[in-house]
Amino acid sequence: MPSSDGPILDAVGLERSFGALRVLRGVDVRVHAGEALVVAGPNGAGKTTLLRVLAGLARPSAGEVRILGVPVGPSAPDARRAIGFVSHLSMLYDDLTVHENVVLAARLYGARDPGAAARRALEAVGLADRGDDQPRRLSRGLLQRASIARALVHEPRLLLMDEPFTGLDAPAAGRLRALLRQRLSAGLALVLVTHHLAEAWELASRVAVLAGGRWALEEPRPGDLALFLPRYHALADA
């Protein structure tokens, strides 16, 4: 359930420009503990840029991101440590094993026992027996699961995910949804970007459509995906 103590993520007036190109145009994002905001939209809408700004990996041209009430930035390492980020591109080092990659993330985020934390994270995503593999030897789906373990190893308060179901077969996708439901029930705040709403529909507390760098829609999840999809396509194609 949402916390009465305020949101985990509170971002206001986010703008991001590349020269004359405005990619984000005054976007507000607020997510409480136990909530999942699922974001969809057409290619080029600004979804990945939004996640990078929320994660502190890109600076907004205007606006502010606060995690647990603290502005995200170089001078706020505690706010950054509260974030887990799953990119649509691999963030793993090919010269390290999967286990070593996850241990490295645990150390960077200050885990008390990085090795044990890495083993728990790999087990949670079904990779307990693949820790000695190098990322280059993994399939796209296994690589995605390793990236999710890396993002979860430090028990973040906020998880940002960009197309996390890409490359996952049906059993692995089901396992990921079950894991995310478990973490949400324990108070995780989640922002999940997807091109395929059906993959994440059951997880969503709220759904949003980003189009042209703005929210075209942001509301509690409707009950019926089939009834929602015509609205989504009308907004995304406008």
Give the label of every model feature segment.
Residues 155:
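Conserved catalytic motifs of ABC-family nucleotide-binding domains
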Residues 194-195:
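H-loop/switch region of ABC-family ATPase nucleotide-binding domains
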Residues 63-71, 79:
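Conserved ABC transporter NBD signature motif
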Residues 55:
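Helix-to-loop junction immediately C-terminal to a conserved catalytic motif
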Residues 159-162:
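Catalytic Walker B motif of ABC-type/P-loop ATPase nucleotide-binding domains
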Residues 40-42:
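The feature captures the beta-strand-to-loop junction immediately N-terminal to the Walker
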Residues 103, 107, 113-130:
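Conserved ABC ATPase "signature" region
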